[in-house]
């Protein structure tokens, strides 16, 4: 089960793939569960996240550990997070340039989001049931 006590400060950190950012989200928990601002434009841009337009909003659900999706690359940016459980995320830069073929991996849980720039492939495998 996700423990929100370790997620109290918003941070935005660029990964080894240029333009791909790891976002640590403040999560506020109590006896009812937890709450988070999944995306807050002004705060995140002030910390270095690029401005982007929402082109499409997708939600996926996987009932079993080990479900794998990807790798997918679309001609738009992505903002990825989970509402429950953990996934092992993997990204590969498909853009022409010095970072072509570079791979980055990171675990995502409800306190973590990833900004994926267009041209970078995205995939994940669930580490828990009901993600």
Question: Language-model segments: what does each one mean?
Answer:
Residues 1-108, 128-130:
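Non-catalytic, conserved peripheral segments adjacent to functional cores
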């Amino acid at each position: 089960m996700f423990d929100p006590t370790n997620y109290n400060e918003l941070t935005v950190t660029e990964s080894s793939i240029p333009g791909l950012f790891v976002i640590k989200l403040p999560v506020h928990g109590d006896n009812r569960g937890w709450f988070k601002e999944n995306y807050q434009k002004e705060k995140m841009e002030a910390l270095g996240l690029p401005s982007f337009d929402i082109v499409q909003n997708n939600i996926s659900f996987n009932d079993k550990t080990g479900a794998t999706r990807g790798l997918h690359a679309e001609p738009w940016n992505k903002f990825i997070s989970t509402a429950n459980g953990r996934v092992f995320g993997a990204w590969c830069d498909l853009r022409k340039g010095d970072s072509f073929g570079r791979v980055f991996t990171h675990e995502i849980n409800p306190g973590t989001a990833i900004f994926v720039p267009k041209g970078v492939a995205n995939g994940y495998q669930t580490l828990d049931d009901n993600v």
